A protein has these predicted regions:
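Aromatic (Trp/Tyr) and acidic
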Residues: 1-179
Length: 180
């Protein structure tokens, strides 16, 4: 997701600095395509932000990898099954066609219990590049962080891209605090 947002940001900078004003409309259109990608117009039909259903997303990210949100946590693991799930607005790493199990798999992870975790999961494996995504929060040796871990790099790239369409003249409507 960071790569997608950074590509959109290239067009934002191109437009912002008027590098070729004849192409500004095209740059705006391309930026909006990248924003739409993050908001669900992508091969997975998934809004790549956590817990966005209450804000109108048809299908948003329900779980991400994070050391604090341990798999099966009754409080934080998954929006659908935990008390809270991850907070709204986290962005997972995104599709990763290079995801793989740890090198200790299938039989050198230190114990039979660990070796039993060495299951190839499909997806993300054996999928086209942009479909190589799965929502899960399993640590070593499945290494779900390669797909679902959030990072400041992805968050900031998305926010920079999103800032390209923010209407600076927006006003707050007193009823229901909605942006006009």
């Amino acid at each position: 997701n960071q790569t997608k947002c950074n590509h959109g940001n290239l067009y934002q900078v191109y437009h912002h600095f008027n590098l070729n004003t004849a192409n500004n409309a095209l740059a705006e259109k391309i930026m909006s395509h990248y924003i739409h990608y993050m908001h669900g117009i992508n091969p997975n039909a998934l809004t790549y932000l956590t817990k966005m259903s209450a804000l109108g997303a048809d299908r948003s990210v329900n779980t991400i990898y994070h050391g604090w949100f341990t798999e099966g946590s009754a409080l934080w693991d998954d929006v659908r099954t935990s008390t809270y799930g991850p907070a709204p607005g986290f962005i997972p790493g995104g599709p990763n066609p290079n995801w793989s199990l740890d090198g200790c798999c299938p039989s050198s992870c230190g114990s039979a219990v660990n070796n039993n975790l060495c299951n190839i999961t499909n997806p993300p494996s054996n999928q086209p590049a942009l479909k190589s995504y799965k929502e899960w929060n399993t640590g070593w040796p499945q290494n779900s962080w390669e797909v679902t871990e959030n990072s400041i790099y992805s968050q900031s790239a998305y926010l920079f891209l999103l800032s390209s369409i923010v209407n600076q003249s927006a006003s707050i409507i007193p009823i229901a605090n909605q942006i006009e």
